[in-house]
């Protein structure tokens, strides 16, 4: 059984969805978890649930697009738990539109949250992971769209592709300091982020919501089944607990066969 006893994890976007599932599983397996989210109240609530179940957790308000906020939040996690061993860069949003109608402000917002956020949290975490070559694991939440493309998602696809480059560069640079990195690439997971997309895509594509699910989101899976937050959390646990750098700089697609590499 994987164990994270004595480890400290900082997880962004962890008040709900995939991030919360990872935080809960990490805590069950011995890690102290810092729940970082732009919504302080929601972060505190998620941390309280973990503590009520016997785990160690703290809620931290963090806007991943602000370097000052990221640095302050990361330092707060280290002050609370003494170290930082795992970073999960998970915060994200979705905005869809055709390229010719995509507002530049929305484009910049998407890249700021997904890609700048990944960079800023990594930079802040490395200050602690590089110290005395302590090491650590950085996991970026990518997507099948780190490898594929879909209509209406130019900014999202661009940002998720960018995380592959960041992770691979970190794998090479971080090796000297015992830092590993990966990208988890889920298929569609029925989180609030995806629930929001269903009516949006139905309207934009002129089809029913049922058709969006069956013929857009799950069309290329082998079984027509959504990936779950538990699937992603188990993958994140496996990668964080893996005992060596035999796995680093890799992309792990968890998508019911939607994308096979």
Question: What label would you give each PLM region?
Answer:
Residues 98-99, 103-111, 217:
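Substrate-binding pocket helix/loop in short-chain dehydrogenase/reductase
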Residues 143:
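Residue(s) in the substrate-gating loop at a strand-loop-helix junction
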Residues 88, 175-180, 247-249:
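Short, small/polar-rich loop/turn modules that mediate ligand/substrate recognition or access, typified
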Residues 122, 159, 167:
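Active-site helix of classical SDR
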Residues 100, 148-155, 176-177, 224, ...:
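Active-site loop immediately N-terminal to the catalytic Tyr-X3-Lys motif
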Residues 148, 236, 244, 248-261:
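Short C-terminal tail/terminal secondary-structure segment
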Residues 127, 131, 172-176, 245:
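Alpha-helical segment proximal to the catalytic Tyr-Lys
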């Amino acid at each position: 059984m994987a164990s994270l006893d004595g480890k400290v994890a900082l997880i962004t976007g962890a008040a709900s969805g995939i991030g919360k599932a990872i935080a809960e599983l990490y805590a069950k397996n011995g890690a102290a978890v810092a729940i970082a989210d732009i919504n302080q109240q929601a972060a505190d609530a998620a941390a309280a649930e973990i503590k009520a179940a016997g785990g160690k957790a703290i809620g931290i308000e963090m806007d991943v697009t602000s370097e000052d906020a990221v640095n302050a939040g990361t330092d707060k996690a280290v002050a609370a738990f003494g170290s930082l061993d795992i970073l999960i860069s998970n915060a994200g949003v979705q905005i869809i539109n055709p390229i010719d109608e995509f507002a530049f402000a929305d484009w910049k917002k998407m890249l700021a949250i997904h890609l700048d956020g990944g960079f800023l949290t990594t930079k802040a975490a490395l200050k602690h992971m590089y110290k005395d070559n302590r090491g650590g694991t950085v996991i970026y939440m990518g997507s099948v769209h780190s490898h594929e493309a879909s209509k209406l998602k130019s900014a999202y696809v661009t940002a998720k592709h960018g995380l592959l480059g960041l992770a691979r560069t970190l794998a090479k640079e971080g090796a000297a300091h015992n830092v590993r990195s990966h990208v988890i690439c889920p298929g569609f997971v029925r989180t609030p982020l995806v629930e929001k997309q269903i009516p949006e895509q139905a309207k934009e594509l002129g089809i029913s919501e049922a058709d969006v699910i069956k013929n857009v989101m799950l069309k290329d899976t082998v079984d027509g089944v959504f990936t779950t937050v538990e699937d992603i959390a188990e993958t994140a646990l496996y990668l964080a607990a893996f005992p060596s750098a035999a796995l680093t700089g890799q992309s792990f697609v968890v998508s019911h066969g939607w994308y096979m590499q």
